[in-house]
Amino acid sequence: MPVARKPLWLDFRVKGFHPDPETNQPILVLEEAQGRFLLPIWIGMPEAGAIAAHLGGHTLPRPMTHDLTHALVTRMGGQVVRLDVRDIVDGTFHADLIVRDPSGREHVVDCRPSDGVALALRFDARIRVSANVMNRGAPILVDEPRPETMAIRAVAVDDWTARAKLGVALEETDPDAFGKFTA
């Protein structure tokens, strides 16, 4: 009988954003902890705004969805301990938030990676990506000179331009519009 192997995980952190050159949709760029790989994940503007606001230390006058979720989990004595980006199905990334309750029991909650990153940042939680995702998710080797990845790599390594573009887009968006988006 074959021995079941534990999945291999790599630690990642948020590197920055890059707008898709064709659609202007935000691309969240995750960087492997040792700086060897970048993993681009296309996300929605509301999630990009939530991540960017937190990274920039901005507090909005009213709590947004991720702030509310953080407050609920915290006030109930829980803690998000990590985000596991575990799979890609039909080009869509799938992830799990691992939430520890006050008794120490861990609960696995299915989520989109973008929401998971927004919450992991608020809890200072670990972000991991499975080897399965790395094998199927088109990671970018930092030193690999492929023309189709040069724009993402350039912004990820020095993402001031992308931050400025995202900042302008967010400044031009009415804050009330974030409540009108539907999934």
Residue ranges and their predicted role:
Residues P2-A183:
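Divalent-cation
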